[in-house]
Design a protein with these regions (language model features):
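Amphipathic, Lys/Arg- and hydrophobic-enriched alpha-helical face
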Residues: 59-78, 93-95, 171, 222-223
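A short pre-motif secondary-structure segment
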Residues: 181-185
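Structural recognition of an alpha-helix C-terminal capping motif at a helix-to-coil junction
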Residues: 83-90, 94, 102-114
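Residues within helix-turn-helix
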Residues: 79, 193, 204-207
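Hydrophobic-face residues of short alpha-helical interaction/recognition segments
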Residues: 67, 71, 108, 112-120
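Intrinsic, short, N-terminal disordered tails of RNA polymerase sigma-factor systems
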Residues: 1-62, 121, 127-177, 190-200, ...
Length: 230
């Protein structure tokens, strides 16, 4: 029996994105996208001896699966996620010469996140929430919990035990700021500093959003179990 999260291990969309990005950006063919050296470029296109195509293949392509997963969680639809990642890859390609050899995964996911929110703003504005109103509550939550955000909590234990379909449904109900934070941490394994960089908020806000996201997911799953038992 397939689970609700089977799409996370399905690489077909990732391969499709690779092909479409290659076609749209005139990038190397599929063999080159898989890791072979791209053809030599003009000297002015090179950064430290590496042309833009080879740099893109080295920096961006290894993180396409994570990029698609984040876009899929944010948009809630596989085809929409493919469109978002394609656009994000083109943005990344245009800006690849400015990448400073830092955390490539965080850099790519930041672009994907921005692209996803732009797409949502144009296509589903009602799904977006204003995050400014959350800040005061989040600061209070950080003060209450302190800085030990890594510790196991009842929320994380219940989430770990939940079946995949229930978990996906509960995560989809989260407001985007909470959803992306939980996905980046509990699904994709980014640390708090990386999440803060991707989302553009302080680490304390990341901690608060993660705690509140886990609590909401736990509440949703618990209610589902209660309703099923009743």
């Amino acid at each position: 029996m397939s689970s609700g999260l089977d799409w996370m291990t399905d690489l077909a969309p990732v391969h499709a994105i690779r092909r479409k990005v290659a076609d749209r950006a005139n990038l190397p063919n599929r063999m080159e996208l898989a890791g072979r050296q791209a053809p030599p470029a003009r000297e002015e296109q090179r950064v430290n001896g590496e042309d833009d195509q080879a740099r893109f293949a080295r920096v961006v392509l290894p993180h396409l699966a994570d990029a698609y997963a984040l876009a899929r969680w944010l948009t809630g639809d596989g085809a929409d996620a493919e469109d978002v990642v394609q656009d994000a890859c083109l943005r990344a390609f245009r800006g690849i010469s400015g990448f400073g050899e830092g955390n490539a995964r965080a850099w790519v996911l930041t672009i994907v996140r921005h692209t996803a929110y732009t797409w949502l703003g144009k296509n589903r504005p009602a799904t977006l929430v204003v995050t400014d109103d959350l800040e005061a509550v989040e600061r209070a939550e950080v003060a209450r919990r302190g800085t030990d955000a890594e510790a196991e909590t009842p929320e994380t234990e219940l989430i770990a035990k939940a079946d995949a379909a229930s978990l996906e449904a509960a995560i989809k109900k989260l407001p985007p700021p909470f959803r992306e934070t939980l996905v980046l941490r509990d699904v994709q394994g980014l640390d708090y500093k990386e999440i803060a960089k991707v989302t553009g908020v302080p680490i304390g806000t990341v901690m608060s959003r993660l705690a509140r996201a886990r609590q909401r997911v736990m509440t949703t799953i618990a209610k589902e179990h209660h309703d099923a038992a009743g």
